[in-house]
From Swiss-Prot:
GO annotation (BP), single: translation
UniProt entry keywords in alphabetical sequence: Ribonucleoprotein, Ribosomal protein, RNA-binding, rRNA-binding
Gene name of this polypeptide: rpsH
Quaternary structure and partners: Part of the 30S ribosomal subunit. Contacts proteins S5 and S12.
SUPFAM superfamilies the UniProt entry points to: Ribosomal protein S8
A Pfam family hit: Ribosomal_S8
InterPro entries, A to Z: Ribosomal_uS8, Ribosomal_uS8_CS, Ribosomal_uS8_sf
Protein name (database record): Small ribosomal subunit protein uS8
Residues forming coiled coils: none
Ribosomal protein listed as a keyword: yes
Length: 130
């Protein structure tokens, strides 16, 4: 049986891994998942990530904790296969009044809502992270 929403599965693995205080989580890799992991690393929500394997590549995310607490307080899927959510540059949301990020897929790649606003780009809102 094929997976219906691999991005929601990725976010759930991160959420569950941090709830169980795991050091790292692994999942099947894709270009979009690697791009999202790169944004999460740049913004300081995960420690690191790496892709291993050639035939069936696996993405391993090293989770980040601060004083024993998970850095990611909440991670929520927004646009999903059954209901895509697109926003123009002036409609991009601010998550937790700017304390969190919205991961946006634009024509120039996957980036934060802040970076998309500065570049003057809109796109598909993938998820909110705080």
């Amino acid at each position: 049986m094929s997976m219906q929403d691999p991005i929601a599965d990725m976010l759930t693995r991160i959420r569950n891994g941090q709830a169980a205080n795991k050091a790292a989580v692994t999942m099947p890799s894709s270009k979009l998942k690697v791009a999202i992991a790169n944004v999460l690393k740049e913004e300081g929500f995960i420690e690191d990530f790496k892709v291993e394997g050639d035939i069936k590549p696996e993405l391993e995310l090293t989770l980040k904790y601060f004083q024993g607490k998970a850095v990611v307080e909440s991670i929520q899927r927004v646009s999903r296969p059954g209901l895509r959510i697109y926003k123009r540059k002036d409609e991009l949301p601010k998550v937790m009044a700017g304390l969190g990020i919205a991961v946006v897929s634009t024509s120039k790649g996957v980036m934060t809502d802040r970076a998309a606003r500065q570049a003057g780009l809109g796109g598909e809102i993938i998820c909110y992270v705080a």
